[in-house]
Amino acid sequence: MANSQVLSTDQISFFKESGYLILENCIEPDLLATWQEQFWWCLNSSFDDPDSWPTDQTFIGRWRFTPPCPNISAVPMVQAAADQLSGGNFIGGGGAPIIKWPDSGGQWSLPRSSHIDGYGPPSQHPEGGLVLGATTNLHDVESKGGCFVYWPGSHLSTYDYLVRHPEQINGSFLDNEGWNYTEFSKGATEGPTEFHAPAGTVILWHGFMCHNGSPNVNTTPRIGIFGRWHYKKLEEMRYDILDDLWKHWGI
């Protein structure tokens, strides 16, 4: 499937306009069940036993599931979609689980702030070169359940900002006095939107799309699996997009 065209023309157009694309039933039930089993075995815990949840553990570094699908990028439909979008110019895709444990007595609201990946500490991200993300949940997630939150269309307003301030594409916008990511998200076509969906649904999102986490006031944990891709020729390509956002994509 990795070499097949799994995305339609309409899906690609939607992705380019909105900055994200939701793929339903993307992960086969058997694979999803295997991932769930491995995850909870690693935590020496059980989804069905809240007393066993290690709520102080919110991130598992260097995580890999058992082959042939050690991470989200190896899921056949995800791999094929990423290859189709990238035209072969992206690498990466691995990512660790990020856990939002329930706080049923907490207060819930959509986040007001956001960020884009790729401009954090070098140990975390290749600065300025992340272009595509993918997120799925190991279990069903409902609204207010610790959802991944995104600002539709903000990839274009982020890009517009960098076109107007090309010297800041290296991440120096973070040094601006009083910097706030609303400089990017204020041009979004919609406000912050929750990604809540059945387990095995995947959202693909552009690397310039503003996003954030959110509180979980439901009764079950949100186990998010993330993948991120960056340019193969990182140093060359990350600065070479100011004339065309899609210059090094396959679409």
Model-derived segments and spans:
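Non-heme Fe(II)-dependent double-stranded beta-helix
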Residues: 2-17, 24-124, 248-250
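Short catalytic/ligand-binding loop motif for oxyanion handling, primarily in non-cytosolic enzymes
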Residues: 32-33, 101, 143-144, 159, ...
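Non-heme Fe(II)/2-oxoglutarate
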Residues: 45-50, 163-164, 199-204, 208-251
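Active-site rim elements
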Residues: 65-71, 121-122, 182-193, 212-214
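Short edge-strand/loop segments of extracellular domains
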Residues: 100-102, 151-158, 228-234
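Short, structured patches in soluble enzyme cores that scaffold and shape functional sites
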Residues: 116-118, 136-140, 152
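Short, conserved beta-strand element in jelly-roll/cupin
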Residues: 123-143, 196-199, 204, 228-231
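Double-stranded beta-helix
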Residues: 141-210
